[in-house]
């Protein structure tokens, strides 16, 4: 869980620069021997680099969830060529998933469950992410419109974790890791004060999801930071719900390790859909400040190897658990986390 007595304030350039100068350590050889690992968002960037590293660490099975079959097959062939003849091509399986479409996410989980016996899904790495220069929307299964970035960055990983939960609970030592960012700490009490002080006449409260996704307050940066905050709320909700389930079934030990990781500022194609000016600036900025995608992916990979209560609900960054404190108070966090998590489960039909 997050802590509220650590360093405060928005994440600085100097913090990012230190990460670039001090990349994390790679995972030990053979780390995934006998394990089945599933990764989403792995056709390029950090997700691809994580898949490549895991493929070289002797997994039993590696499932690549990519937007299209063609992108996934291209990634598979590149991984096979890079790792070399020691990697059997049958180990890698490609299954398409469009994370902006919740019905596609459900179909993906159905396909995986059909081909994955109970007790054999060891690691799930949720690395699909999206940044857009403008507010685009998609319609969910109930007809409600949401920003595409919110669906990809928050709803899809939440749904994946919930859909895979029974399969993960049947696998001893299973891990679900979501790729996040400590930039969730950039959301401040001032940013959320309108939500906490407003009420709907009918229900007594205002929808937190509608507030965060209001087109009148949408900016690329705000949407990114707040999506990361909501993803932390999802993480805490998964941990708390599991604890409640364990308490009601004391004789069963079916605990899944849920955690987040932050790869740091990395040189990727995240801003590929932005204008030339933004892309040029980020290229220069990343050249000076950032890690390579390969270095950032090390954090994703080593995070999957963590075990124990010490890691539960934590964020793994720079080879340690993050100690940065949120930009909102502990009381604000408790209120918002509960509201956001319950609303997300309602949207996903998991309430």
From Swiss-Prot:
The active site is at residues 224, 228. InterPro entries: NAD(P)-bd_dom_sf (IPR036291), SDR_fam (IPR002347). The keyword NADP applies. Keywords: Antibiotic biosynthesis, NADP, Oxidoreductase. One of its GO terms (biological process) is antibiotic biosynthetic process. The keyword NADP applies. Short-chain dehydrogenase; part of the gene cluster that mediates the biosynthesis of sordarin and hypoxysordarin, glycoside antibiotics with a unique tetracyclic diterpene aglycone structure. First, the geranylgeranyl diphosphate synthase sdnC constructs GGDP from farnesyl diphosphate and isopentenyl diphosphate. The diterpene cyclase sdnA then catalyzes the cyclization of GGDP to afford cycloaraneosene. It comes from Sordaria araneosa. It comes from the Eukaryota. Its EC number is 1.1.1.-. This is Short-chain dehydrogenase sdnK. Pathway: Antibiotic biosynthesis.
